[in-house]
Amino acid sequence: MKTVIIKLTVIFLTAFLLTAPGRISADDKYQKMINCNLHAGPCTQSFSENTVILEVTPRPVKAMQDLFFKVTLTGKLSKAPRAPYIDLGMPGMNMGPNRVQLKPSGNATYEGRGVIVRCPSGRRTWQATITIPDSGQIDFIFDVIY
């Protein structure tokens, strides 16, 4: 009887492990959305004939630690009358409000502090939506380390 239970357990675990990757790595579809590697350095995106640069330190970017966010605007956006801000969240998941308020630090650069929380689902793909008042939004999608 003990041998039968062991064999059934082995069969069950083998079947689970062979089919689990699709279930365990549910955020694979979000991995394909990543457009930024903040661990390597600042990320740059074009926005309405302008450029938005996002930098997060310290690197590597880890959840549940105090992070320093820096946004630099170029082109017409460099004369934005109001400071941009960052909303942190996860693609496809409502994480509740997590806003990084940015303050001007000179030369069309804005800085602020924030924390990326650890998601109970285990997903590590995060999104920083930078809102430039009266101009629009741009998304930087990246991985964090837990």
Briefly describe each language-model feature range.
Residues 1-9:
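Bacterial N-terminal signal peptides that target proteins for export
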Residues 22-125, 129-132, 138-146:
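Contiguous segments within soluble domain cores/interaction surfaces
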Residues 9-17:
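Bacterial N-terminal signal peptides
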